[in-house]
Amino acid sequence: MRRTPVAAVPLAASLLLAGLAAPQAAWSAPQAAWNTPRTAWTSWNAPRASWNAPRAERQEAFRAAAARYGVPEKVLLAVSYLESRWDAHQGLPSVTAGYGPMHLTDPRRALRLTGPHDALHPTGPRRTSHRAGPRRVSHRAGRGTAEEAARLTGISADRLVRDPGANILGGAALLARHQRDLGLPMSPRPADWSGAVARYSGATGAGDARHFAGEVFSLLRTGAGRITDDGRQVWLSPSPEIAPHMEHVDRMGLREGGNRNTDCPANLACEWLPAPYRELPGGGYGNHDLSDRPREHRIEYIVIHDTEETYGKTLRLVDDPTYVSWHYTIRSSDGHIAQHVRTRDIAWHSGNWYVNAKAIGIEHEGFLAKAGAWYTEAMYRSSARLVRYLARRYGIPLDRAHILGHDNVPGTVPGSVAGMHVDPGPYWDWGHYFALMGSPFKATGGAHAGLVTIRTDYARHRPRYTGCEEPGEDCRPHGSASVRLHTAPGHGKPLVRDVGRRSGGRSTYGVHDHGARATTGQQYALAGRKGDWTAIWYLGQRAWFHNPHDAPTAVNAGGLIVTPRPGRASVPVYGRAYPEPEAYPKGVPVQPIVPLQYMIPRGQRYAVGLATHGEYYHSTTYDETAHRLVRGRTLYYQVQLGHRVAFVKADDVDILPSSV
């Protein structure tokens, strides 16, 4: 019988084992946080020591542009926040060819800058590599708003995309033109600009237009404030009394869609674009599996991906019965959502069948590393609302043990580890994303709590990466959610090794190499402190990251940890939590329980994310009546092993409170 320290039993039982039977209990805390109206102000509340006397020129630029074109200043600020969070992005285009704080689009310029995105992926061919040809930059409704803004302002398109102040003037001019085109007065009241705001989104469907306008007015009510990526301080004071005039949007004559067949919240614009489910020659089928979740088995995870393709091509790929699949795609330009696979069914998206069987996959239009491929606020907000809704509906806790990046999903066996995908990568802003879901990452313990939660100041934290444009070349400085991990305190010390990523385990600064990285929201067991450096247990090593007191990159946390049982020199870890052989019924092949190439040595501690009994969903035929769910008695703990999660058998470890 496995020995568990007496002191750990009540805590472990209440927080983990009981959660197997009562998943909704884990939801209560995040859900309460969603109702806090100041969630949009998270960046404003960041440590002020890191602001370095921010300048107010951008605030003045909004004020001047609003006055010049007769647009309410708050409307201009709110629209810009939805487009870019007021950032300039170093004059680089978004994935939808938008530039600057107002996201003025110039597709031809963006295509000249970015070119085709067909460079060889460092970890092997991308999933779309079998479809040759250059990718086109996506943009709204085929028009470039920078050219329109140039005609309205007399400012060159080149300056409009490069100069943030000019860019804001261009956005104000476009809003004013939309207001006039709708036959509406140049009113000082924000509500009277609902139609112009909706038209600014470029949406061609009524649902998308209403959603964008609704998000802008939601922001007007809550307010926001932050320091931009180039050090400018911007503030939008809250106006809780403001409500949009949606009848202005209704009179725009846009196409009505509807989310009648989708699993989406009512206030999101979703459409049903089904992925095919059909038999293929030779006895195969594609491109997903039918199931009956959660009635038959629970949904435990939501996996966040980026597409590495434009929205249009992504839709063509998911329509291919010989290809892979995912549940949702979110468009960058306006946050529009397409659902392809019903949540009760199993999509083929994570590269790990165990995770697929228990997960919902969401693709976001974007490119992990290409210069300027930043994600719009509209996309972040749509995704956050969708994930919040799905988490509540299916009892999924809002934490990084359950909301995974594709780059957090483990390989199933040693041979699959190196080829696992690495999206959404270090430029996905996990802190902002979780704040939008009402579950910001906070300190949950004191100095002796025993765990740390990674939490970078995204805009200010700009570690070195290479390989965004050319192999080995430094990437442009950019905000990042990840910290770098070294073998000893000091920026010049070697990076920790990841024996699964490449031969010899050597880690690099490559933007696609997460072998020596930890990312915002992930929790690790504390392994030491020395000056401005903090150590964690990571892939069987003590790993150090820079965590200075005046600009912290992590906060203290409490929870549960596992450590090898006494007498064990090390314990194996697994990429899937499969049942014991005795659990399989006749006719279902026994799946081997194969350890990964990693292990947890004696004396090391790893943060626990969840507990689960072994499970395998057998689905190898088009006929769903032959599908079988196998449940075992073996108990596993999911741990934060490295950048990816992994599983350990409960019989191999002791589970303890994390406090030290």
Language model segments and positions:
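Basic/polar, cationic surfaces and motifs that engage anionic cell-wall
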Residues: 212-274, 372-479
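Intrinsically disordered, low-complexity linker and terminal regions at domain boundaries
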Residues: 548-591
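Catalytic glycan-binding domains that act on GlcNAc-containing polysaccharides
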Residues: 55-222
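Structural recognition of the beta-strand scaffold that forms the well-ordered cores
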Residues: 75-78, 101-103, 300-306, 325-330, ...
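Second-shell loop/turn segments in exported
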Residues: 50-52, 61-69, 153-165, 183-187, ...
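Secretory targeting and sorting signals
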Residues: 1-28
